UniProtKB/Swiss-Prot annotation:
InterPro entries: Exonuclease_RNaseT/DNA_pol3, RNase_T, RNaseH-like_sf, RNaseH_sf. The gene is rnt. Its cofactor is Mg(2+). Its EC number is 3.1.13.-. This is Ribonuclease T. It comes from the Bacteria. It comes from Yersinia enterocolitica serotype O:8 / biotype 1B (strain NCTC 13174 / 8081).
Length: 215
């Protein structure tokens, strides 16, 4: 069990929150009506010196839920064919159940109280995860119901860029545009970006908070 008073521990860095990077690919913008087609998650860890690093990765292609809307423009944009049997897609329930199980394990190991979604334009990904969890009747959702860490906002502050590819390149993180709009690739790059932003703030002296400012 991690010590919450240890500022080099994950639980001490984010006030007991356990950050998990998420990216989804969908068949539209409406989380209630449009299909979730792909999801990836990257958990994070702190090393002994307090530097944030990617940890475990989970990735699933997802079958559209019954009656889901499939917007042709969205499918053309992300290049996903929901009917392709080679996708190896699973149900929303199975995908989220596996992710939630891994997240709850990480919560316990890191001594955190609750998971929080990290994503680029996080409201979008958060809304699809929450809607899918409700459809799948998954009661033990480890994620905060509304709070998120948004790397688009953080990148705008730190790097002057809000587009994922431009933010990564500005931060010195390679970004292959030909792999963009794959949930797996975007999640991995977003995880690297979030770690870079958090670690850069530490290097600049912003963390731990100077004595007197945290009181």
């Amino acid at each position: 069990m991690a010590d919450k008073s240890d500022l080099n521990a994950l639980s001490g860095r984010f006030r007991g929150y356990y950050p998990v990077v998420i990216d989804v690919e969908t068949a539209g913008f409406n989380a209630q009506t449009d299909a979730l087609l792909e999801i990836a998650a990257v958990t994070l860890q702190m090393n002994k010196d307090g530097w944030l690093l990617p940890d475990e990765t989970l990735h699933f292609h997802v079958d559209p839920f019954e009656g889901a809307n499939l917007e042709p423009e969205a499918l053309a944009f992300n290049g996903i064919d929901p009917t392709n049997p080679l996708r190896g897609a699973v149900s929303e329930h199975d995908a989220l159940h596996a992710i939630f199980k891994a997240v709850r394990k990480g919560l316990k190991e890191q001594g955190c109280n609750r998971a929080i979604i990290v994503a680029h334009n996080a409201h979008f990904d958060h809304s699809f995860v929450m809607a899918a969890a409700e459809r799948a009747s998954l009661k033990r959702n480890p994620f905060h119901p509304f709070a998120t860490f948004d790397t688009a906002a953080l990148s705008g502050l730190v790097l002057g860029q809000t587009v994922l590819a431009k933010a990564c390149l500005t931060a010195g993180i390679p970004f292959d545009s030909s792999q963009a709009h794959s949930a797996l690739y975007d999640t991995m790059q977003t995880a690297k970006l979030f770690c870079e932003l958090v670690n850069r703030w530490k290097k600049l002296g912003g963390w731990p908070v100077p004595a007197g400012e945290s009181e």
